[in-house]
């Protein structure tokens, strides 16, 4: 799989990443045995922030993913969807999946709109100031199939996901190339139907190890 799964879409308007709202992990997973997920966000700046959150369903979390319609209006809910976050404060955002309990994995983009509270309160005549202290951050939520089937194939340093739920795969051990050092490690997310070859770890070596996560379950492969 040439494209990394779950890219961060971070579009800033006049502020640096260090000043942006801290939304935690770029990608979040709701396992098949859970219908809720919590994310903690933090305002690490010295001023209050106005946060608005929107959800979009995606055909894929990869770069070529398109926004598609949800199966039902209340398929994925969240609370709170809008909040005022004081300086150096944090808040827990909760997500609730109420969609179909089928064998399909679903992908959502969480869009975080963040702007300085002082700018948000200004009138239309001063809207240019808002753009200098605002950000739009995109993260990904993967909802595993309610009926998850975990299957994979491994051969010659390559893993193929033959199931219907994304796997987190990893390899560690001696480096394949001496230029990379003695010990290497690789971590990837592997979507259903995709394959990934490890390129830094010498998986053919007896000390090379390959493993994966099926939800919360750790599975040694080699």
UniProtKB/Swiss-Prot annotation:
InterPro entries: EcpB_C, Ig-like_fold, PapD-like_sf
Coiled-coil blocks: none
Keywords: Chaperone, Fimbrium biogenesis, Signal
Position of the signal peptide: 1-20
Note: Not expressed under classical laboratory conditions, but is functional when constitutively expressed.
Family as reported in the entry's similarity comment: Belongs to the EcpB/EcpE family.
Name of the protein in its database record: Probable fimbrial chaperone EcpB
Species name: Escherichia coli (strain K12)
Lineage: Bacteria, Pseudomonadati, Pseudomonadota, Gammaproteobacteria, Enterobacterales
